């Protein structure tokens, strides 16, 4: 993937916005306004450039942040809220789909053995 600087300006603005607002509910309309494009053109351009939709990109950011927090021994329910997932069930399901482990299993990897 190209670096953030090398991306088309609308895609760069959207990726930067997503990185800064991943804990919030983000809509395609909001992203279209950030990109100064209509939402359908943005969706096509973003998906062509990044290989995934803006929503999947957002969830990827959230999972990355969640991994960091789980490694710090935070509870999965707390991590779900801190990373912008609507509920723990959605977070757990998506985390397992992407990582192959439940959030609790992932967290346990980092627990100090007593």
PLM features per residue range, with description:
Residues 34, 82-83, 98:
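Residues within the alpha-helical elements of helix-turn-helix
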Residues 1-17, 41:
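An amphipathic alpha-helical interaction segment
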Residues 31-39, 43:
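Helix-turn-helix
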Residues 16, 20, 25-29, 47-92, ...:
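Terminal helix-turn-helix DNA-binding modules in bacterial transcription factors
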Residues 11-13, 25, 35:
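Acidic, Ser/Thr-rich low-complexity intrinsically disordered segments
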Residues 54, 102-103:
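Proline-centered helix-kink/hinge sites
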């Amino acid at each position: 993937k190209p670096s953030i600087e090398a991306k088309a300006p609308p895609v760069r603005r959207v990726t930067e916005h997503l990185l800064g607002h991943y804990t919030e509910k983000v809509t395609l309309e909001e992203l279209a306004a950030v990109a100064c494009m209509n939402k359908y053109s943005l969706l096509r351009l973003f998906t062509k450039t990044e290989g995934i939709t803006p929503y999947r990109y957002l969830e990827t950011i959230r999972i990355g942040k969640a991994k960091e927090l789980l490694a710090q021994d935070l509870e999965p329910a707390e991590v779900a809220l801190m990373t912008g997932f609507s509920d723990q069930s959605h977070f757990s399901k998506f985390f397992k789909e992407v990582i192959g482990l439940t959030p609790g299993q992932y967290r346990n990897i980092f627990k100090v053995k007593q």
